[in-house]
Amino acid sequence: MDLSEFAEEIGSETPVSIAGLATRGGPVDGIQTVMAPVGVEWVQPEEMTVRCGAGTPVEELDDALAASGQCVAIPPTGTVGGALAVAHSGIRRLGYGPVRDTVLQAGYVNAGGEVVKAGGPTVKNVSGFDLCRLLVGSRGTLGFIGDVILRTRPRAAYEQWFTTTADPFELFPRLYRPTSVLWDGVTTWILLEGHPRDVDEQATRHGLTIGENPILPSGGRWSIRPAELPGLVGTGDFVAEIGVGVVHHADPAPVRAVDPAVAELHRRLKREFDPTGRLNPGVDVLSAT
């Protein structure tokens, strides 16, 4: 995908921000706002890879992959680039892994207005892979992603949410490859995928009941240690992702002090990638949840 026009729009001098579908923010007053290229360039089912513009809505990408019976491990909200920028893995992270592992190659524009390619186009080629990982979750402060090559996965033949009142911490180790395990202090939701017979057999073995999709509180996304999860009971409405360390809470995430070593590493990275601070000015990556 040709990113020359995208790079020209970004330029190399004045402050600039990037926006997707405005699901996590929109244009900033007084600052030029750009949008990443849109569209699926190609799908290679035999290689289980796909290339698309970072501005492509995830739902559009899913539709393009449906014909080959594949999908990507990115939640169907917003754009591909937006999900990568905020490292939004979604509630299937337990089974699908973190969203950063989906990226094989990224084409991005740096603070100097140059197009840079990181990573490789196939699953076997991991050249520059660490730089792709660095961009994921950086919220556009190190570079603006223009296009990506993503690893696809087979679309599940069958999936079903189940519920139980069993202790999730005792049940979780006994489950076989659950896609998601959620808990609100009373009810445990379990998402199982696979062959219908295998899913039903596991549900019967653990006494699970078919349930509705869980509704997540929209107040804040907390990151906590697994040992702290029982202490959430009584703190307000929440849904915790068991085995992941993420909690969707009705209240905003508590402010925590940033590790000085982490802060220093971030400053060094920012100084190397964007010395003038022109990319997404005002975005605080360290305080983001």
Residue ranges and their predicted role:
Residues I74-P75, V80-S180, G185-W189:
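FAD-binding subdomain of flavoenzyme oxidoreductases
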Residues L191-T204, L208-G211:
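Terminal amphipathic helices with adjacent charged low-complexity linkers/tails
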Residues L21-G25, V38-G39, G146:
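Short active-site-proximal "capping" loops at secondary-structure junctions
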Residues G20, I190, H249:
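Residue-level signal for inorganic ion chemistry
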Residues W161-V181, D200-H206, S223-D237:
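Short amphipathic alpha-helix segments
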Residues M1-T23, V255-P260, D284:
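N-terminal accessory segments
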Residues M1-V16, M35-P76, H88-P121, A157-T164:
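N-terminal glycine-rich flavin-associated loop
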Residues P27, G185, R205-T289:
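Conserved glycine-rich FAD pyrophosphate-binding loop
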